[in-house]
Amino acid sequence: MGSSKLKRAIGAVKDQTSVGLAKVGGRSSSLTELEIAVVKATRHDDYPAEDKYIREILCLTSYSRNYVSACVATLSRRLNKTKNWSVALKTLILIQRLLTDGDRAYEQEIFFATRRGTRLLNMSDFRDASQSDSWDYSAFVRTYALYLDERLDYRMQGRRGKKKSGGGGGGDGDSGEEDDHRGTSNDIRSKAIVVKSKPVAEMKTEKIFNRVQHLQQLLDRFLACRPTGNAKNNRVVIVAMYPIVKESFQLYYNITEIMGVLIERFMELDIHDSIKVYEIFCRVSKQFDELDPFYGWCKNMAVARSSEYPELEKITQKKLDLMDEFIRDKSALAAQTTKSSSKRSNKSEEEESKTEYIQENQEDLNSIKALPAPEQKEEEEEEEKMETKKDVEEVVSRQDQEGDLLDLTDEAGVTAGTVGDSLALALFDGVVGTESASGPGWEAFNDNSADWETDLVRSATRLSGQKSELGGGFDTLLLDGMYQYGAVNAAVKTSTAYGSSGSASSVAFGSAGSPAASMLALPAPPPTANGNRNSPVMVDPFAASLEVAPPAYVQMNDMEKKQRLLMEEQIMWDQYNRSGRQGHMNFGQNQQQQYYQLPYSMGPYSYTPRY
């Protein structure tokens, strides 16, 4: 307790010293009285300032703009020197009262005034270290000064906007009427001017966004001014809270008015503006949730009348969800429309490019001009070339018709088609006809030729090359094949086969006869017909394949067949030895008895011949 009394005494001494210095300063009486009134309104005690000193300051500064500047300078020195939270808070309360009830010049002077190189109301570095429990008071001083600074900035921007719009109220200042009752004696004419701000419903959306942003920032500064700790029960703090709580009521009304306008325009706004509105509503919802308990504390502390507090309309989460859903649907629809518009634009661009291309082609076609007529020399040269080509073709055709009588290869008469036909006939039973090597192949007699006698003789000399065809489309190759069938079979029978052995009288045909022949041996040359070597008998061209050993499964089948034939032959010889009869009649009668008297044991294998 002794330390607190000592501090109070020291504070009282400082106040008396400041008053004495103001009296001895040698200034005018008005400035001296103004400085003394400021010192008395901001004493070092824990009691609120008396209202008479504040009214005296307002009265002294209402005469001249110089007194306003002197008052602001005195307040700046007071804030700069003091380290006591009570003096600093009382000075801020005086500034707030001057801004509200004083002349407009206070706003400009305080707005442009500096303290330690910064703005006058920038108290972020303030700290009272004189007491251990002064931290809560220092924090309230800092937040209170920050609120006043933000409020002053908001009002100055509103005034600048009004000046730019020519006084038509297009700025973001306070709504309602503003009377110039705070004007000085030099502004008597301006007192009659009543400035009306533009209604929010008539503002543009961008200006509404700008204004609500400033109001939300100012409301955040007010919410930060809620005292904590020991500052909640201090009388000076409660007196400082009263004016800003009254101002917060107007802030709430302005924000709700803007919210109503935004809700009306929400359906017509773009997606970008709709997102801004959604963000504004989310922020306002959080601010109203914090404002409700703050107003409850203010009511309990009797900061203002309970009837003066507004009824807060909170923004529910359901409303925010509806807004979010609407924005999502609108963005999805916009995306679809942009895709369709892009497709249409692409199609239109393609059509335009096609039309441009067609127009360019038409222009090119229209720009084509007739070429000049060719000269007579070129025509004569072309005619000479054509004549030389015709002469060469005639010489070549004559050589083809005459042929070379000494040519033994007969290349003139043999073509690729005839060679292919001869090779194909060699695979079958036809005799390849050989033409005479005396000249070209046979051609039909030309009746239109001039030298018909020589042509007749030439055609008669090549009668052997004619293709004789009988009437009715009968093929001579078929007839020759019928006559040569026996000779071909004889040649096949006489040809050697793989692994042939046995007697000539063996019933197993092909298993006995000629001795075994060597594998991969070509057959003997074909026999001639009637000793004429020029007319050979055709033999199977694939006879050489019989000399090659077949696969294993083919040889097994052949061996089984030979075994069955050998069994039949032995049965027939046994029957002949017993009864002396031959033929198949006796064989059929004794078939059952002969089966069990087989001299050879064949195992489980049994065979019944079928005739």
From Swiss-Prot:
<dbReference type="GO" id="GO:0030136">
    <property type="term" value="C:clathrin-coated vesicle"/>
</dbReference>
<keyword id="KW-0472">Membrane</keyword>
<dbReference type="GO" id="GO:0005545">
    <property type="term" value="F:1-phosphatidylinositol binding"/>
</dbReference>
<dbReference type="GO" id="GO:0090404">
    <property type="term" value="C:pollen tube tip"/>
</dbReference>
<keyword id="KW-0333">Golgi apparatus</keyword>
<dbReference type="Pfam" id="PF07651">
    <property type="entry name" value="ANTH"/>
</dbReference>
<dbReference type="InterPro" id="IPR048050">
    <property type="entry name" value="ANTH_N_plant"/>
</dbReference>
<dbReference type="GO" id="GO:0072583">
    <property type="term" value="P:clathrin-dependent endocytosis"/>
</dbReference>
<dbReference type="GO" id="GO:0090406">
    <property type="term" value="C:pollen tube"/>
</dbReference>
<dbReference type="InterPro" id="IPR011417">
    <property type="entry name" value="ANTH_dom"/>
</dbReference>
<keyword id="KW-0168">Coated pit</keyword>
<keyword id="KW-0254">Endocytosis</keyword>
<dbReference type="InterPro" id="IPR008942">
    <property type="entry name" value="ENTH_VHS"/>
</dbReference>
<dbReference type="InterPro" id="IPR013809">
    <property type="entry name" value="ENTH"/>
</dbReference>
<dbReference type="GO" id="GO:0048268">
    <property type="term" value="P:clathrin coat assembly"/>
</dbReference>
<dbReference type="InterPro" id="IPR045192">
    <property type="entry name" value="AP180-like"/>
</dbReference>
<dbReference type="InterPro" id="IPR014712">
    <property type="entry name" value="ANTH_dom_sf"/>
</dbReference>
<dbReference type="GO" id="GO:0072659">
    <property type="term" value="P:protein localization to plasma membrane"/>
</dbReference>
<keyword id="KW-0968">Cytoplasmic vesicle</keyword>
<feature type="domain" description="ENTH">
    <location>
        <begin position="26"/>
        <end position="162"/>
    </location>
</feature>
<dbReference type="GO" id="GO:0005905">
    <property type="term" value="C:clathrin-coated pit"/>
</dbReference>
<dbReference type="GO" id="GO:0009860">
    <property type="term" value="P:pollen tube growth"/>
</dbReference>
<dbReference type="GO" id="GO:0005794">
    <property type="term" value="C:Golgi apparatus"/>
</dbReference>
<feature type="region of interest" description="Disordered">
    <location>
        <begin position="337"/>
        <end position="406"/>
    </location>
</feature>
<protein>
    <recommendedName>
        <fullName>Putative clathrin assembly protein At4g02650</fullName>
    </recommendedName>
</protein>
<dbReference type="GO" id="GO:0030276">
    <property type="term" value="F:clathrin binding"/>
</dbReference>
<feature type="compositionally biased region" description="Basic and acidic residues">
    <location>
        <begin position="386"/>
        <end position="401"/>
    </location>
</feature>
<feature type="region of interest" description="Disordered">
    <location>
        <begin position="158"/>
        <end position="184"/>
    </location>
</feature>
